[in-house]
Amino acid sequence: MKTAMGIVLSALLLACVAQDTQDKPATQDKEQAVRDFVAVRDLEELDKLRSSSNDSWQVIADEFIIYETRKADYLVEFTRACYALEDRTRIVADIRREMNIMRSRFDTIRGCRIRKIFALTEAEAAELKQLGESPGSRN
């Protein structure tokens, strides 16, 4: 009886470990796909962007968002995974040198330090938003 219980618990533990390792590559693959997109498209890296109270964002991967302003879209890369942006509250930079300017390497958004900011065209933003989605997954 104890041997059977030990085998069942071992199998359950292995199944949990296998599930955990299966989830991580998908996230890493999406982040790598965004990095490849930046390299292939040779996106222009910016030092700063002008923000306002009406700005919005869309999470692309754990370390990337598309920051949408009235005039332009930007790809923002964080120094680490930023889970604080998934609750969809209004985006506000935490630390700023200037009121309506967000700077890469210095400012943070909801505790996540901005590593890089890239300028995007409308077509590039649309392509990044669809990254990782299967055909027909949006209604």
Protein language model annotation of sequence segments:
Residues 78-139:
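Helix-rich interaction surfaces within compact, conserved domain-sized segments
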Residues 12, 49-50, 113:
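Generic detector of short, well-ordered, non-transmembrane alpha-helical segments enriched
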Residues 1-4:
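Positively charged n-region of N-terminal signal peptides that target proteins for export
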Residues 6-15:
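Bacterial N-terminal signal peptides
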Residues 18-77, 133-136:
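N-terminal secretory signal peptides
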Residues 8, 61, 121:
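Residues that line or immediately flank small-molecule/substrate-binding pockets and catalytic motifs
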